[in-house]
């Protein structure tokens, strides 16, 4: 029986000058540095025999993840074309979206953030909902 290997890649740095917890919010794209990170990751994956034979590329529908996945897809497809293989297409899947978070859209750092206000620390330390909104069971059920 042939083994299947799944590689998980986190998105590059996000342009977020207001330090908002963006979670599932639209409109949060890669920063210039994030694009360079995605391109460097793409080059690495395309150059490695262990990863450049990918059969599929999946991404959540979030802007930053699609941008990162697209950089990887472009590099892998260049390698595939050099081997006369069919190009891959990006598959987006809502089930692999980031975990839900009760602090979505708020500032959470720099001392004045939502984590430190109105007893919110109790939410942060709840081990049954480590993402402060969506439990491990909920995540497992959707994935």
Q: What function would you assign to each model-found segment?
A:
Residues 2-84, 137-140:
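Active-site-proximal alpha-helix that buttresses catalytic centers in soluble enzyme cores
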Residues 75-142:
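Phosphate-handling substructures
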